[in-house]
Amino acid sequence: MKPLTAGVTRANEGLDQISWNILGQTYVPKSLSEDSFSWHATFPPGTFVPPHIHTTQDEFIYMLEGRLDLVLDGQESFATAGDLIRLPRNVPHGLFNKSETTVKCLFWVSPTARLYDLFWGIHSMAEQNPADVVALSAKHEVDFLPPPPEGA
């Protein structure tokens, strides 16, 4: 992986013009080094990232627009524009846009670990079916949690 270089990634651009479709959201990578990885995310209404754990990374989300409903270590919460979501490694978390407006936010993780490669893998799937996404994610140090039991 290349070392971090000085510079500016413009507002409507990603690294190397990359834009990924990840579970119905748009992720645009902004910076990448061994120590950290950041991306701009757009969550259309009704999209979500199911509860999961990053085993090798701390994750942060700075909210730019809209509201995300969260499940953080089993507790429900939410974040709106200007809020920072802190997600230490090994803490289960899920992100949900339950609103009727688009959510925009900036994510970053430290260290990068295998997340950049995971996003390429998910984006490249012909169909992002849950079983394949879960299996690929496990190979990249992100573990999705099973759904809660019926009636829970």
Task: Kindly give the residue locations of the regions a language model identified.
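A short, N-terminal "cap"/entry segment at the start of jelly-roll beta-barrel domains
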Residues: 1-37, 125-152
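A hydrophobic/aromatic-rich effector-binding and dimerization subdomain
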Residues: 3-5, 108-127
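Short acidic-glycine-tyrosine-enriched beta hairpin
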Residues: 10, 74-92
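Conserved short histidine dyad/triad with adjacent acidic residue
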Residues: 23-24, 39-54
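Conserved hydrophobic/aromatic beta-strand scaffold that supports enzyme active sites
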Residues: 38-42, 60, 76, 84-86, ...
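Glycine- and acidic-residue-biased ligand/ion/polar-headgroup-sensing regions
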Residues: 56-58, 62-68, 73
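Ligand-binding loop in jelly-roll beta-barrel domains
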Residues: 69, 89-116
